[in-house]
Every structure is written in structure tokens, then in C-alpha cells.
């Protein structure tokens, strides 16, 4: 039997609507974890449908860390001004700005990486593999595998989310689209770090941001 307390708990854990929670629990025969997975799968499907919708509202979120040592500006779009003003959306924008400060991505998504950058990285990785004495027939597979790792480091959406490394930033974005009910798009960002490119004492400001994010979960 599905109780109101079970529905309430599922709603608190997922943010889904009451009827959606009730139906998921019924489908899962009262199994809470299975109901969460059902809601997650439905949410992913719903998010995919919303992904093509035009999003021109939103915010430009600013984050400054450590007395002005790291600064980030990120533009995140949604469909309506109403959603842009919600705490849920504002909190998401803040998390993304802090992610950029901490994890130093260079692009939003892999499609944004210029082809010449990819080819240069591929050449470097190929040379490394050959220098390791790997047989020619396995070098290309190694290069492609290492190139995937490169994308996960430099592309924001493919990075592990610092507050929860079990998911990527793209997973987080998909969850927010499903929960909020509008298309959300991380359009662009810029990141500055004091003294970047200059000879200076080594200080890991990004690690400080990451630590602060984990404390403020």
C-alpha cells in the first residue's frame, strides 16, 4: 500500500510532483529506490523534449573567490523571467559559476572545441603513445581513449560535478531541466585568475573553491 508519507518522502528526495511520485511508487510496488530511478528516467525523457525550446531569459551569474583572486561570469538561459528569479535557478547558476572557478573548464561542450585544438591534442597523444613503445595497431585506440579524458577535463558539461562527483555537470543540467520544467542552456562563460600567465608563486586557488563548494553542500 502506498501511503501519503511515502509520497511525501519521495517528493522531498526528488522534487517531482505529488501525482508523479504516487504513480512512480505504484509502478515500483512501493520500492523507494526503484521509484526514484523511474522518476529519473522519466525526467531525462522530459528534459530531452524540452532541449530544443528557445531559452532567452536567465541570468549572468558572477562569482568572485578569495578576495578577488578568481573571477567568473557565466550566462545561463531559461525560457521565462519567472524561472530566472526562482531560488532553484539562482542556486543552480551559483553552483555552475563555482564549478567553473574550481575546475577550470575551457569550453561549455565538446562541440565548442575548435577542430585544430582537437587535432593538435590528438598529435600530442599519438606521440606520447608511440614514445611509450606501444604497438601501432593499439596506438589509435589509446589516442581516442585519452582524447575522451581530455574532453572531460576541458568541457564544462562533461566534468564531474564538484558537489557530487558521481554525476557530471550535464547530468545536473538535465535534472534541473526535468525538475524546473523549462529548457535551460549554459551559453557561455569567462574565467579569470589573478596573475594567470605570469611568473608567480604557485597557489592552488581552484582547490580552495572546490573545498568551499564541498563544505557548502
Curated annotation (Swiss-Prot):
- Xref: NCBIfam families: tsf (TIGR00116)
Q: Which GO terms describe its cellular component?
A: cytoplasm
- Give the function comment from the record: Associates with the EF-Tu.GDP complex and induces the exchange of GDP to GTP. It remains bound to the aminoacyl-tRNA.EF-Tu.GTP complex up to the GTP hydrolysis stage on the ribosome.
Q: What is the protein name given in its UniProt record?
A: Elongation factor Ts
Positions of region (Involved in Mg(2+) ion dislocation from EF-Tu): 80-83
Q: What is the lineage of its organism?
A: Bacteria, Bacillati, Bacillota, Clostridia, Thermoanaerobacterales
Can you list the disulfide-bonded cysteine pairs?
none
Cell compartments where the protein resides: Cytoplasm
Q: Give the matching InterPro entries.
A: EF-Ts_dimer_sf, Transl_elong_EFTs/EF1B, Transl_elong_EFTs/EF1B_dimer, Transl_elong_Ts_CS, UBA-like_sf
Gene for this protein? tsf
Q: Which UniProt keywords apply?
A: Cytoplasm, Elongation factor, Protein biosynthesis
Instruction: Give the similarity note.
Output: Belongs to the EF-Ts family.
Molecular function terms from GO: translation elongation factor activity
Q: What is its main location?
A: cytoplasm
- Pfam families on file: EF_TS
